[in-house]
UniProtKB/Swiss-Prot annotation:
SUPFAM superfamilies: Globin-like
Annotated signal peptide: 1-15
Subcellular location, record wording: Secreted, Extracellular space
Keyword GTP-binding carried by entry: no
Function per UniProt: May be a globin and may play a role in oxygen transport.
Residues reported in the UniProt entry to bind heme b: 114
Main location: secreted
Protein name: Globin-like host-protective antigen
Organism: Trichostrongylus colubriformis
Keywords, in A-Z order: Heme, Iron, Metal-binding, Oxygen transport, Secreted, Signal, Transport
One of the record's GO molecular function terms: iron ion binding
Residue span, Globin domain: 25-166
Family listed: Belongs to the globin family.
Gene Ontology CC annotations of this record: extracellular region
Amino acid sequence: MRFLLLAAFVAYAYAKSDEEIRKDALSALDVVPLGSTPEKLENGREFYKYFFTNHQDLRKYFKGAETFTADDIAKSDRFKKLGNQLLLSVHLAADTYDNEMIFRAFVRDTIDRHVDRGLDPKLWKEFWSIYQKFLESKGKTLSADQKAAFDAIGTRFNDEAQKQLAHHGLPHT
């Protein structure tokens, strides 16, 4: 039964147009807006506080911060900057989804900036479900359409990411 529900969910996600997926994803991001006010600048760092608390096994990818706690993240200028870069990247991925050429170029650029970090290639897909859970931790109730949108973005993102990893001769799935 679970398989049938999952299959129906995936079929529904792919039945939507790229523009609909874009709109659904962007509407989910209203809980973490971009901006220059102190509270908006904190949104990116909030992701890393969530991430370091709930995915401690992945802290190993952050050299010098492997033992950081959420309190350490809250005081870190490094994670303020990284958080805002990540938040911008998620918004860009969502906002360019309906322009596949630009979306895929953005993914390749993202991979190019991470080639020396030794990331497990499966993380490029897993990130999107982690990000959904982060949004939910901020009080956002994601609709089925919004979840499907992030799944579609994650699938396309991962597809291009794996191609770019292979291009660099790096492990890929």
